[in-house]
Curated annotation (Swiss-Prot):
GO terms for molecular function: rRNA binding; structural constituent of ribosome; tRNA binding. The gene is rplP. This is Large ribosomal subunit protein uL16. The keyword RNA-binding applies. Gene3D superfamilies: Ribosomal protein L10e/L16 (3.90.1170.10). The lineage of its organism: Bacteria, Pseudomonadati, Pseudomonadota, Gammaproteobacteria, Pseudomonadales. It comes from Ectopseudomonas mendocina (strain ymp) (Pseudomonas mendocina). InterPro entries: Ribosomal_uL16 (IPR047873), Ribosomal_uL16_bact-type (IPR000114), Ribosomal_uL16_CS (IPR020798), Ribosomal_uL16_dom (IPR016180), Ribosomal_uL16_sf (IPR036920). One of its GO terms (cellular component) is cytosolic large ribosomal subunit.
């Protein structure tokens, strides 16, 4: 599972997930990419699950890049605990996703295979996504 090796602070405030993705919105490494068209959070488990679906479908062919990293801790208090007494412990890690963010990239496979693989990966994610190709300039 993806998570930071160490952080400056153990816990973070919830914050807001506003705006559009400025950084990480272009296909930089591969030929084809899976791009988010919705706003939300991806947990480390969801990112890994989609990665496995991608890898299994392309069967060692091509190269895959994961363009998101879960760097935000989400805390949770234990069940049946009264309110107060401080913030709960870190339960899992999430990546905050804005519309336009490239999630995964792939190269070395045909477009048809890439579309099928990304469709399988997208089924594992809680966000609406779209298939994009690299534009040569």
């Amino acid at each position: 599972m993806l998570q930071p090796k160490r952080t400056k602070f153990r816990k973070q405030m919830t914050g807001h997930n506003r705006g559009l993705a400025q950084r990480g919105s272009k296909v930089s490494f591969g030929e084809f990419a899976l791009k988010s068209v919705a706003r939300g959070r991806l947990t480390a488990r969801q990112i890994e699950s989609a990665r496995r679906a991608l890898t299994r479908h392309v069967k060692r062919g091509g190269k895959i890049w994961i363009r998101v990293f879960p760097d935000k801790p989400v805390t949770k208090k234990p069940l049946e605990v009264r309110m107060g007494k401080g913030k709960g412990g870190v339960e899992y890690w999430v990546a905050q996703i804005q519309p336009g963010k490239v999630l995964y990239e792939i190269e070395g496979v045909s477009e048809e295979l890439a579309r099928e693989a990304f469709a399988l990966a997208a089924a594992k994610l809680p966000l609406a996504t779209t298939f994009v190709k690299r534009t040569v300039m």
